[in-house]
């Protein structure tokens, strides 16, 4: 069995749906509110687990509070191993999410996620060493990500790095990771002075840029490849990127090519945005296979 470790953020999403966002000093009525488990790391672990029979382990931290307890129960229900999720004397991270007009705005309060420092991993390096693939994002401290990426490079462990949300230090990671999956905005933050095609060619078969409703673009070493998105009735886009990353990682562990892994991930993302919650719409493999068959896309 392929072992995947996701090292990253674990949060509770506080989600409000409204028909418009208030201006400064204005109050508007919302249409709905919910609390659902989230955090980019946790979301990507759940997305992978929904698709794969292989072991996926979450490494991170929650607080000593009701949100933390609820999140650990959610990992259990989704077959994500969580023995390496610590409980720390901090509040569990939260994300305040406003849904409107088929899009979202998010404010993150890291809480316990900021406690996932290199020192926090002191007893976990051997566990990480057992992994065939490690998935990272940007909702834990940069120095932790960099330490993990360097460790994985030294130990021939593949790393999928999702540089979200973007930060100036992300470029330090590039030489130590195998796959980079920014969206278009994050890509511009990473490479502000280079044209997209130039960047993709430089990092062929490593840089995969998601373009929302425009699909996904990458360079295969010979030509630029663009894989279109699939039209859908949008309910909630919050977990689309995390679903993409979890599904892309699954494709890689299934020994699919990069392009076929992307196609699978695009289908998974398409299905995810048709239900509420970052994790609520994440599909099972049977759902993805049914959609692939409907679209006459043969990956297996």
From Swiss-Prot:
Q: GO:BP terms for this protein?
A: D-ribose catabolic process
Give the CDD domains listed for this entry. ribokinase
Q: In which pathway does it act?
A: Carbohydrate metabolism; D-ribose degradation; D-ribose 5-phosphate from beta-D-ribopyranose: step 2/2
GO function term, MF aspect, one: metal ion binding
Cofactors that this protein relies on: Mg(2+)
**How is the activity of this chain controlled?**
Activated by a monovalent cation that binds near, but not in, the active site. The most likely occupant of the site in vivo is potassium. Ion binding induces a conformational change that may alter substrate affinity.
Task: List, from the UniProt record, the residues annotated as the active site of this protein.
Answer: 242 (proton acceptor)
List residues binding substrate.
Answer: 11-13, 39-43, 139, 242
Q: Where does K(+) bind?
A: 236, 238, 272, 275, 277
Pfam families linked: PfkB
Cofactor binding, per record? Requires a divalent cation, most likely magnesium in vivo, as an electrophilic catalyst to aid phosphoryl group transfer. It is the chelate of the metal and the nucleotide that is the actual substrate.
Q: Report the main location listed first in the record.
A: cytoplasm
- Residues annotated as binding ATP are 183, 210-215, 241-242
Keyword Aminoacyl-tRNA synthetase listed: no
Give the Enzyme Commission number. 2.7.1.15
GO CC, alphabetical: cytosol
Where does this protein reside within or beyond the cell? Cytoplasm
As its record notes, the protein acts as a catalyst of: D-ribose + ATP = D-ribose 5-phosphate + ADP + H(+)
Role according to the record = Catalyzes the phosphorylation of ribose at O-5 in a reaction requiring ATP and magnesium. The resulting D-ribose-5-phosphate can then be used either for sythesis of nucleotides, histidine, and tryptophan, or as a component of the pentose phosphate pathway.
Quaternary structure, from the entry: Homodimer.
Q: Which HAMAP family match?
A: Ribokinase
Q: What family name appears in the similarity comment?
A: Belongs to the carbohydrate kinase PfkB family. Ribokinase subfamily.
Q: What protein name applies here?
A: Ribokinase
Q: Which organism is it from?
A: Lactococcus lactis subsp. lactis (strain IL1403)
Q: What gene codes for this chain?
A: rbsK
